[in-house]
Structures are given as C-alpha cells and as structure tokens.
Amino acid sequence: MDIVINTIPLLSRLTGVGNCIYHTARALLEADPHNRYWFYYGYFSDRLICPARPDEKSRGAVSDALHTAKGFIDRHPALRGVIRDIQHAYHRLAAGTLSFDLYYEPNYIPLDLSARKVVTTVHDLSFIFHPEWHPKDRIEVFPQHFRQRIARSDVITADSEFTRGELLELLKIEESRVRVV
C-alpha cells in the first residue's frame, strides 16, 4: 500500500504537532516495512527529513531551501495570505502527479492530495473555543477551511474522548468516523 503523510510542518520550528508527526512517521517506518511511505514537504519524498531537528542526518538542499523559505514567510506575516494561495495552487498541481492508497493528515486540515482513503488527526478544537491562544493567521485560515476539508476524511482521529465528543457535536457526523488514538 502507498501511504502519504503531510510533513510540511517539519519544515518549521517544531511544535507539538510537528513532534507528533515526526515521531509517528518514524514509528511507522520502523514498525511497518510492508507499506511504502511517502512524505509530502511541498514535494514528494520517500525519505523522512526534519530540518528543524539538529540531529537530523538526512537533510538535503531541497529541504534546507524549503526550511529557509518557511522561516522567511514566518518572519513576514503580511505575505502569508498570498503565499497560502500560491501553496494551495501548488498542492493541487502536485496532487495530480501521484495517487495514494492512504493519505494521513496529522495537522487538522487535509490538503488536496489524491488518495483512496483519508485519515486526519484533530488534536483539539481550541482554535474554535479559544482563538486567543492561537496566532492571528491560523484563526483566519482554520474557520474558512476546517469544516469543508475535514469532510473529505474517511476517518478522523482525536487525541482524547473529550475532543472526539466535541468533533461529533460540531460536525454532526457518524460516530464510527471519529476514533480516539
């Protein structure tokens, strides 16, 4: 089976989500040699890389360039909207190049990658219930895209029963689609 994981958050300073992505991907690679894993950094790679980790030995010129570009965008918030539109168009183009059996989106909002099944992790809904805890640009993006894109998911994983309950109430979807991991 061909499985793709969105690893774009690994190009930035690692947060809780970034660390979760990195460790989950590493564990899958070690525990599951039967499937073929792809990692999406804005390009598809069969290598798990994490430029933000000082111990990462598999960095390359492309990942370093993307890490630098992501840092530039982070330092210039006024560009984020324009860059986000360009990224969205690029993801749609890249999505047409490959198709996967499973797409795992570990960061709330699935991209337009082509896969037979989509699994998305929602860690919490604080962006809805506590927007003051989040950067302004995230609060501008999440409400616009979350509900529409999460609907693409065949399965939604939540970090807790509490978050699962919030998802079921908010999204009004079948209970069998939302699971706690």
Which positions does each model-derived feature cover?
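Carbohydrate transferase catalytic cores enriched for Leloir-type hexosyltransferases
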Residues: 1-181
